[in-house]
């Protein structure tokens, strides 16, 4: 593994952001204006409005000295079980295998009473990348307020191929990509673990944590890391603000950056100069003299999660109610990667990315 003494840059400030958010531009309940006001009032510095299959860029409207928008979208592919449906709606044939469906056509089908069972989905973010990524995409960069058709498959699909094509198509348009809420999406491990070129996987989704207890998972992430997939993780809200349960201000990233602007925030996300959390904090971590260490504001337990042989991981727990603020863990050399989880005294968690 790489010997990196400090994973977070010494220069810069910490900026809090939500990378997964929905407004009235898709199926959210808050207008973009209401969402920006709410997140600014709660100490956030940036938000990505990731509307379903709809790319928006509201930077001109909302960017200011202490808050910015990351343009993006949440692109979709679905597999439907059509068992029991006697006749498909006009224009759709099971022999096609799949259709590229616009939101307008989907609404028409619903009006016709077509309610298939959605058995699997891939939800993949495309977030506008760096200036270099946009330049490489040329005239393929997303236009403001652009709808993207979503793929609908009937009864079967090659899940890995579908996800890979979806991610690749977003990257071709100047975006970096994330794989969202795999447990909620009902996907199998083999459909995800060998995906390439995806920046991060969503390990904590506040909305589905509260909706159905299917929003927190690191098993998919570790499975990818164990196979040599150099992928990062992130936490988010995926807020829709429907009012039935809270889904804002619960999952976020903390990015270290010298400036609060699109280029710097995105560059620091891509380089791993951040941690993600649902309430706990981490101030620094790294590897020094073959020991991995972490500094935090006070933890009840700290997990060092390692790839490699059985028994390489370790947990350190606070004793006699005295919170942990700095812990180190000697490495054996057998580890293929290491990442850290900090659980604070209030039961909240912060996650680092992996050193590989």
Sequence positions of predicted segments:
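Charged catalytic cores and adjacent phosphate/nucleic-acid-binding surfaces used
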Residues: 1-19, 33-36, 64-65, 81-92, ...
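A metal-dependent hydrolase metal-coordination microenvironment
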Residues: 2-176, 180, 187, 204-216, ...
